[in-house]
Amino acid sequence: MNHIALFEPRIHFNTGNIARTCAATNTVLHLIEPFGFEISDKHLKRAGLDYWDKVNIVYHKNLQDFMNSIADGGQLYLVSKFAEHVYSDVDYSDDKKDHYFLFGREDTGLPEEFMHEHRDECIRIPMNDEHVRSLNLSNCACMIVYEALKQQEFRGLELVHTYEKDKLK
């Protein structure tokens, strides 16, 4: 199973987009406190997150709480622009294994000491950083979870939809 973990997310729109991706891909969403926004019915409705109840969300009080929750045999990946390993070069094909993709705060990323402790688990998305400091968090989460799903042959997802008024027929 795939898991996306957000360390102290600051921007509710990113978290909402990632939650939608998780709902669409049967991916577990881990939210690590504190947040830079309020999670309440009022705020969720205003953001149009009417699918929030369809997302498997696990809340964690802090990073250590999240680390303690990783299933035996689970694989942790820290997503960072500072990593050496490219995300698409990693083997995620075992869909029986728990793959945890941990993303840092939008403004400061993951704690540096924590990254050093897990240097071998760090992965990156290649980019030209001469002109751009970083990629959007929700885009990154989507890219990485879909790479994992591609390698897992999209098991558990519908590959073809049938609609009453199919625009392609």
UniProtKB/Swiss-Prot annotation:
Keywords: Cytoplasm, Methyltransferase, S-adenosyl-L-methionine, Transferase, tRNA processing. Its EC number is 2.1.1.207. It is found in: Cytoplasm. It comes from the Bacteria. GO terms for biological process: wobble position ribose methylation. S-adenosyl-L-methionine binds at V79, G104, I125, S134. Pfam families: SpoU_methylase. The keyword Cytoplasm applies. The keyword Magnesium does not apply. One of its GO terms (molecular function) is RNA binding. Its main location: cytoplasm. CDD domains: SpoU-like_TrmL. InterPro entries: Alpha/beta_knot_MTases (IPR029028), SpoU_MeTrfase (IPR001537), TrmL (IPR016914), tRNA_m1G_MTases_N (IPR029026). It catalyses: cytidine(34) in tRNA + S-adenosyl-L-methionine = 2'-O-methylcytidine(34) in tRNA + S-adenosyl-L-homocysteine + H(+); 5-carboxymethylaminomethyluridine(34) in tRNA(Leu) + S-adenosyl-L-methionine = 5-carboxymethylaminomethyl-2'-O-methyluridine(34) in tRNA(Leu) + S-adenosyl-L-homocysteine + H(+). Belongs to the class IV-like SAM-binding methyltransferase superfamily. RNA methyltransferase TrmH family. TrmL subfamily. PANTHER family: TRNA (CYTIDINE(34)-2'-O)-METHYLTRANSFERASE. Could methylate the ribose at the nucleotide 34 wobble position in tRNA. This is Putative tRNA (cytidine(34)-2'-O)-methyltransferase.
